[in-house]
Amino acid sequence: ALETIRADIQQGLERVANLDEDRILSAYVNLIEAILRTNYFQQHSPQQPERLSFKIDCAAIARMPQPRPMVEIFVFSTRVEAIHLRGGLVARGGLRWSDRPEDFRTEVLGLVKAQIVKNAVIVPVGSKGGFIVRRLADCAPNERTEEVESCYQTFIRGMLDLTDNRDHNSVIPPPRVVRYDQDDPYL
């Protein structure tokens, strides 16, 4: 079934006459094919907050600039947008609230590079995450801290939605997540 869908998409791309449109559509197809996990199928549960998370294989994205982390988790909701970049299966880093909505991914990528240099002796690869609060300007000054903390929690939950768990020596995948990668109980 998947090969049929790919063939249909390829046929559609062959009908695109404009070079820019072809590049853009091909990049979207490439991005979709690089998705390793999503929490999309968890969204239909009444207990699950509204957020969408994707784990992406950065090496599989043709147009992603260097340096490429091993994986990127992208979390999106109406209140927060977040990413977590990780250079390897075991990586050391942190999370931060960014005030740069236009280029927070660039900011986080720069922090990952610094983390790699800083931790080269301890752990050879780094990780870093960042998030922006989408509605902060709508909050009264006394509500801002609560909004930032709530968005941070949504970010963490979005990553945990995709992350395998451990029970002694067993790895337990998250419910209703189709995995196209190896076990990854990173968090």
Which sequence ranges carry the predicted segments?
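Extended, well-ordered protein cores
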Residues: 1-187
